[in-house]
UniProtKB/Swiss-Prot annotation:
Keywords: Hydrolase, Protease, Secreted, Serine protease. This is Cuticle-degrading protease-like protein. GO terms for biological process: proteolysis. One of its GO terms (molecular function) is serine-type peptidase activity.
Length: 20
């Protein structure tokens, strides 16, 4: 979730947060 909060480009947030 931290990556998504930082606004990481691409879909890194999704990869790290499979949960979502």
């Amino acid at each position: 979730a931290i990556v998504e909060q930082q606004g990481a480009p691409x879909g890194l947030g999704r990869i790290i947060n499979k949960x979502k």
